[in-house]
Amino acid sequence: MSISIYNCFSWIGYHYVHYFLEKGIEVNGIDKIDSEKKENLHMLVGRNSSFRLIPPNSIPKDLVALVIGGTELPIYADRIIQIRTREMKKKLSNAIVINAPILFGEWMEMTEEDIKVGNRNVRFHSREFQSDAIYIKDFVKATAPLFHSSNKPSELSVFSKKVFLNEAVKLENSIYIRDNIPIEENVRKVLAHYRRYKDLYEYDRN
């Protein structure tokens, strides 16, 4: 099996690439390498024989295509899964849309105190972050089964388990992720990575 990942070197896309490669799945990556960070992320996965960086004019047909945000490029896949980020402008035709909560993780736009969420800055210690945020690796692991599932809802929403503690109020077509590791521990891990590779992180306060 192989999967096409559009915007594969966005910080979210990179984590999906890494996850599927670790599972032995071939990944066709589609992205423009136009920053030092993207060059670095390409180096991290480019030596893996199961990864191919695909030119826009040579996009293959795959069973599944994952699109982070949006794309103007053609998509040749039986199933399209689109991660709705804050920058997503429109839904792709025939795509299964996954509405993401606040996500945090390695390589995202951040500082020591906050993360970039769309056009906003969300502080690690804010009530919003503590109640809603999900670590990217937990998000990827929870959504990955959708790539193989025969169930095809048009839209899914992902929530932190902290949002709904009452089993009776769970919404249809929703995924609830429990923090198996305290959020503070994952924040410490991400901050340690940020401090180590700070020069490769990007952040724009405007």
What are these regions (language model features)?
Residues 1-60:
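N-terminal Rossmann/SDR dinucleotide-binding element
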Residues 7, 31, 84, 159-160:
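Short beta-strand/turn micro-motifs composed of small residues
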Residues 11-12, 16, 33-36, 71-74, ...:
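Short acidic, S/G/P-rich loop/turn micro-motifs used as interaction or catalytic elements
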Residues 12, 34-41, 73-76, 87-91, ...:
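Short, charged/polar "capping" segments at the starts of alpha-helices
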Residues 26, 59-101:
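Conserved Rossmann-fold NAD(P)-dependent oxidoreductase catalytic core, especially the SDR/UDP-sugar
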Residues 38-47, 114, 166-173:
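Short, aromatic/basic amphipathic alpha-helical patches
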Residues 91-140, 144:
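NAD(P)-dependent short-chain dehydrogenase/reductase
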Residues 134-206:
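C-terminal substrate-binding subdomain of Rossmann-fold SDR/epimerase-dehydratase oxidoreductases
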